[in-house]
Design a protein with these regions (language model features):
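Structural signature for solvent-exposed beta-strand/loop edge elements and short helix-capping sites
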Residues: 1-158
Length: 158
């Protein structure tokens, strides 16, 4: 994708030109230009849909992201090229799981981001990028938000 400066590769993929979509499995990795740097997205499955200027990239299961000053994990990811919204999501917990898991166990499934000495977590994390510069403008954490940072004396939570 030369318009959005995105690349997706993996060991197996299928392209559906009529539907403007592609699916990549078996070690898929997507590379997206963000902040004049590369954001690497790895997942069990990557799905790209829509024309280049409106492309949506969705990653399922075991998502890992990495950029020079930011890294993270989540169950799934949704990247909207047009709006610049990157969502790190937790797979919804079913009724049976909610009965078996403690609140602490459910929180451990939340997406997590690390930047420098800061760890951020919550049920849903939004990274908003400027659609013209691809710079990360803001970060929002929804529900059960935790931001922890370790200083030189002792750890503290914000």
């Amino acid at each position: 994708d030369t318009i959005g400066n995105n690349v997706i590769r993996g060991e197996y993929g299928e392209v559906f030109k009529d539907k403007d979509s592609a699916i990549v499995t078996q070690n898929p990795i997507a590379v997206k230009l963000v902040d004049k740097d590369s954001l690497y997205i790895h997942a069990d499955t990557l799905l790209a849909t829509g024309p280049a200027e409106n492309r949506i990239l969705t990653g399922y299961y075991g998502v890992r992201i990495y950029k020079t000053n930011l890294s993270g994990v989540s169950d799934s990811i949704h990247v909207d090229q047009k709006s610049g919204l990157i969502q790190l999501l937790r797979y919804p917990i079913g009724d049976r799981e909610s009965q078996l898991l403690s609140a602490s166990d459910m929180t451990k499934r939340n997406p997590v981001l690390w930047s420098a000495k800061t760890q951020m977590s919550g049920d849903l994390i939004h990274l908003l990028t400027d659609s013209t510069t691809n710079a990360i403008d803001s970060l929002k954490i929804f529900n059960n938000a935790v931001v922890a940072e370790q200083d030189s004396l002792n750890p503290h939570s914000i």
